[in-house]
From Swiss-Prot:
Residues engaged in binding Zn(2+): 337, 388, 513
Record-annotated disulphide pairs: none
Subunit structure: Homodimer.
Matching Gene3D superfamilies: 3.10.20.30, 3.30.54.20, Anticodon-binding domain, Bira Bifunctional Protein, Domain 2, Threonyl-trna Synthetase, Chain A, domain 2
Record GO biological process: threonyl-tRNA aminoacylation
Keyword RNA-binding included in the entry's annotation: yes
Protein name: Threonine--tRNA ligase
Cofactor: how bound: Binds 1 zinc ion per subunit.
GO cellular component, one term: cytoplasm
UniProt cross-references to SUPFAM superfamilies, sorted A to Z: Class II aaRS ABD-related, Class II aaRS and biotin synthetases, TGS-like, ThrRS/AlaRS common domain
Length: 648
């Protein structure tokens, strides 16, 4: 049996015998063969050592390829599992799953009565290093389903048996390295000696298959990179991220709390946190107004007839909350779009009324398993800055470009860099392929006309249309998915939305779903970590604290505070019977942007000493000058202090 192989440049290589991608790489260049770690075969990622089909297109995966981590991190997950089995005994260790995740990998274990802690990680790492030095080959093999089940039963691996029984295929794929065998689709590195730089990070609990009705397993997380410098940089970033964890900083600053006993996954915002949310909404409302949007409010609960018609009942029901009254079933809204559609349908629409741009700070509820809840970043109830644009097909491209410009206006004051993903048709899509292709092309044209960097995520669109996801990069280099622009030709069809064109005929509008913050709660959590709690002045819950040096300066401090409050500044007076240094320290811990130190000299000269939270001072400033500049900083939503400070 021969092989006919097409290379990325379109050239063809033919062989009269079976070959692997490693063979092809060696034929092309010995240097290339050394750099290759995997291969893409007809769009799928394969091991280098897997025999190629008779006809195929291949693209070798090199170390710098963004897909490269899929190979070495997956191999690390198997090395981790093998190490755990060697240490704790193959008779005691029951294997769950061990996938690649963003920036790393994990493996789930059932260890019976053995309880892992982070103190166990060094000895597991040591055993992993031994396995790497052994340079064990990873050998892929397939078994018929029944033989695969028998193999896993013989090895006393009940979780693997369950996975095989659920396979739709009649064949199961395994990988062997030394004495270790695991159910796995791959891909992997050729041998354990081909991986180097890793670190085990943490141990946590995880329900089998993410279902809290199942047994709690023990999950070990790890990370791995192609270069030592990349691993070191990531670990440094992770250390910084721990310091910035919004789940610690938020309660410390009195921003929010959670009651997992009474309202799991539902944030409780305290006065200071509510101030920040209101400032974010105020900013958003200003930009919406400039772009021609109209704010609306729609019902929190609507009956099941609406959700059947919208398609959410069939495609999203498992994530919804329900109630029943008067023999009528209702759902708490997981999305705002049906309510906005009802506004569109409330009157006859003409082409002159379009585009109609409706937006809402809508509270939505979506069920999330308890195991995935994560502070403000993964909740069950949250606020969306949700908007829907109803327009003609002729208006579509310009409206999409306007939304992209809107994204830039919102993200710029926070200092975020961002990029876009174009997400295409998923397997469970609604509607016609032709309409999907038209919608996808419209999104692509809009992105390219703006000149925005983007990549394509095949199959990652929503069930009712393709979308653009925006990813922001925070101050320590992490990416967060926030804004979404979603095209929808399906919902107008389902709700029979129409408008009368210039020829007096009825036409179907196009619908654009759009959120910029995304989840306001999640965006808040991201900002806490982005700023490490030290919000710019316009967002800070308390913008200024007046600090009287002693009791005799309290009246002057109140006078200064009242003057600033009259100008709209959020200001407190610290009247505690504590030392000035104590008060300054407390203000710094509370991340208050400005401290006004007020003593005899300031009172007599009717001036103030301005201290920034970083410790820099300006002496003898007139209150009127400070107030004017502060208002300018706040109104322009500046990310840095407007004042020029000198270090003491």
């Amino acid at each position: 049996m021969g092989c006919k192989i097409e290379l990325p440049d379109g050239s063809i290589k033919e062989y009269d015998h079976p070959v692997t991608a490693a063979d092809v790489a060696a034929d092309l260049s010995p240097a290339l063969a050394k750099r290759a770690i995997g291969v893409e075969v007809n769009g799928e990622l394969w091991d280098l050592t897997r025999e190629l089909p008779e006809e195929c297109k291949i693209n070798l995966i090199l170390e710098k390829d963004p897909r490269a981590p899929e190979f070495f991190r997956h191999t690390f997950s198997h090395i981790l599992a093998q190490a755990v089995m060697r240490i704790y005994g193959s008779d005691k260790v029951k294997l769950g799953i061990g996938p690649v995740i963003e920036n790393g990998f994990y493996y789930d274990f059932d260890l019976g009565d053995i309880r892992l802690t982070e103190e166990d990680l060094p000895k597991i790492e040591e055993e992993m290093e031994k396995i790497i030095k052994e340079d064990l080959k990873l050998e892929r093999f397939e078994l018929p389903k029944e033989e695969a089940i028998k193999l896993m039963k013989d090895q006393n691996q009940p979780y693997k048996v369950e996975l095989i029984e659920d396979l739709e295929s009649d064949v199961a794929t395994f990988y062997r390295q030394g004495e270790f065998v695991d159910l796995c689709r791959g891909p992997h590195m050729p041998s354990t000696g081909k991986v180097k730089y890793f670190k085990l990070l943490s141990v946590s609990g995880a329900y089998w298959r993410g279902d809290e009705r199942n047994k709690m397993l023990q999950r070990i997380y790890g990370t791995a990179f192609a270069k030592k410098s990349e691993l070191e940089a990531y670990l440094k970033m992770m250390e910084e991220a721990k310091k910035r964890d919004h789940r610690k900083i938020g309660p410390q600053l009195g921003l929010f709390s959670f009651s997992y006993e009474y309202a799991p996954g539902m944030p409780i915002y305290h006065p200071k946190g509510t101030i920040v949310l209101n400032e974010l909404m105020k900013f958003s409302r200003e930009v919406h107004s400039k772009h021609g949007y109209q704010e609306v409010m729609t019902p929190q609960i609507m009956n099941d007839v609406l959700w059947h018609r919208s398609g959410h009942w069939d495609h999203y029901r498992d994530n919804m909350y329900f109630t029943e009254k008067d023999e009528q079933q209702y759902a708490i809204k997981p999305m705002n779009c049906p309510g906005h559609i009802l506004i569109y349908k409330s009157r006859a629409m003409s082409y002159r009324d379009l585009p109609l741009k409706l937006f809402e700070f809508g509270k939505v509820h979506r069920y999330e398993r308890s195991g995935v809840l994560h502070g403000l970043l993964r909740v069950r109830g949250f606020i969306q800055d949700d908007a829907h644009i109803f327009c003609t097909r002729e208006q579509l491209k310009e409206q999409l470009k306007d939304v992209i410009r809107f994204v830039d206006m919102i993200y710029t004051p926070f200092g975020f860099e961002y990029r876009a993903d174009l997400c295409t048709r998923p397997e469970d899509f609604m509607g016609d392929v032709e309409i999907w292709d038209l919608a996808t092309e419209a999104l692509k044209d809009a992105i390219e006309s703006i000149g925005l960097e983007y990549k394509v995520n095949e199959g990652d669109g929503a069930f009712y249309g393709p979308k653009i996801d925006f990813h922001v990069t925070d101050s320590i280099g992490r990416e967060w998915q926030c804004a979404t622009i979603q095209l929808d030709f399906m919902m107008p069809e389902r709700f029979e939305l129409t408008y009368v064109g210039p020829d007096n005929k009825e036409y179907r509008p196009v619908m654009i779903h759009r959120a910029i913050y995304g989840s306001l709660d999640r965006f808040f959590g991201i900002l806490i970590e982005h700023y490490a709690g030290a919000f710019p002045t316009w967002l800070a819950p308390v913008q200024v604290v007046a600090i009287p040096i002693s009791d005799k300066h309290v009246d002057y401090a109140r006078e200064v505070a009242d003057a600033l409050a009259a100008e709209g500044v959020r200001v407190d007076v610290d009247e505690k019977q504590k030392s000035t240094n104590y008060k300054i320290r407390e203000a710094q811990l509370n991340k208050i942007p400005y401290m006004l130190i007020l003593g005899d000299k300031e009172k007599e000269s009717e001036t103030i000493t301005v201290r920034l939270r970083t410790g820099k001072n300006i002496y003898g400033m007139k209150l009127a000058e400070f107030s004017a500049k502060l208002k300018e900083e706040i109104s322009n939503r500046m990310s840095e202090s407007i004042f020029k400070f000198k270090a003491d």
